[in-house]
């Protein structure tokens, strides 16, 4: 199994600079409850519905990235990521159907504030910045989910038997997903080496950290659904 190099290159550096926020993201109570199988079903349903809307905007972000890259190999790599998301959507729809959520129902849902904040931030970075800025904004989701999936699969406290969320956990620790993440990190590093400038680290760190915080807020959105039901 190819394990992405989470601690290396520009990604590893930005991840370290965002260490406190990164930990709040990858070890969020939503993630911990996925691991234990104790997450409230309505919290997961809220997450799934909003994730469907999120993925549509994420595909648009990759389409924008293609237009900003310099070489055909780079453009092909970004296009492959976009196609992976577009091809993932029918699988996502099928998975949601198992939870009693239809695609028309998801498509008709308004975007939650957390979804709006996150997706529009990434798209704004893409429109106002260059390919490197946009790649950095995309990485907390792309690589973060792999780190979460692998971490949960390897953690002895994670419950996989009789856990309704086991297939979600396995999906993000799957070899196919990890290969895609490794390719995304390689593209990030290639673009960084083309534009390498220490003067940009502060700005790139701010983008990465902001996207990381928005990821944690996306988890919290799901947990808030359970709290709203109890209220």
Feature map (PLM): residue ranges:
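Active-site-proximal alpha-helical scaffolds that flank and shape metal-associated catalytic sites
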Residues: 2, 73-179, 209, 213
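Long amphipathic all-alpha helical oligomerization modules
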Residues: 174-208
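Short alpha-helical hairpin
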Residues: 2, 15-39, 58, 185-194
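Acidic, carboxylate-rich catalytic segments that either coordinate divalent cations
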Residues: 202-231
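Alpha-helical bundle segments that constitute or directly flank the non-heme di-iron/ferroxidase center
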Residues: 19-24, 38-68, 87, 136-146, ...
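Secondary-structure edge/capping motif, primarily at the C-terminal ends of alpha-helices
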Residues: 65-69, 126-129, 152-156, 191, ...
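Basic/polar N-terminal segments that are highly enriched at the extreme N-terminus
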Residues: 1-12, 16, 227-231
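A non-catalytic, amphipathic alpha-helix used as a structural packing/dimerization or gating element
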Residues: 46-57, 80, 203-210, 214
